[in-house]
Amino acid sequence: MWRSAAIGFLLASGLVQAQEYKGAVACGDLANAFGPFDYRSASEEDRRLVNGAHFTQQVETLQSGKTTNWPGGDIDYTLRAFPNHPRALLSMMNLSFKEKRNKPNGAHWPVECYFDRAERFRGDDAYVKVLYGIYLLKVGRNQEAISKLEAAERLEPDDPNLYYNLGLAYFDLKQYDRALHYAHEAYSLRFPLPGLREKLKRVGAWKDLPPPPAQSAAVASASAPPAAGSAPATRASAPVAAASTPTETPAP
């Protein structure tokens, strides 16, 4: 599923000089000949129609276009039909970094416009805000990134991917205590990527969580000598069966 650690693996490296592009004047209104549809609730038929014709694997992985010379043209079509299509947003962002262009070849607008359009279309979609936040992180707008990621957390709490990216944002701001907090939140929910933990270790800011109080008490109890008469009964304290010999050790 797209929300998994795949986001961390697919992000391209490098920065693009970015300015803000927002609103219908800069980024176009949302009217479209086909759609726009909410990708979360769109029919399988509509998804297949667009993904099969435009958002193919070769387009998603930025190898080539399907109906145009550039993958950006097919990604643009996909995002005009489904403004909050998460994998298409990720691909448009990565294409921008790959080409080192704010407006990738084949796109109608600069890359930030696609995040703006997705937010205007469905402001309650947490993963639009996650991806927008990741984009802002990549172009060095960290405070804005944190604002987007925190808004996503309010919409979708207890999500390890959100926690991980919040941790990265705070790390880049050198707010290591906050980064550590979100790292623990992410890893407690079994987030698989070790990058944030390794970053914190390199700056000496990583700390393991202490064991929960109940676990600490259990460990202390196990290591203390038992009080007289307090040990639970075992077969060793029961009468030995007649068939036993003095060398046998009864099982607990």
Which stretches of residues belong to each language-model region?
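N-terminal leader/linker segments that initiate helical-solenoid repeat arrays
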Residues: 18-74, 81
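Helix-start (N-cap) detector for alpha-helical repeat units in TPR-like alpha-solenoids
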Residues: 86-87, 125-127, 142, 160-161, ...
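Canonical tetratricopeptide repeat
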Residues: 91-94, 131, 165, 199
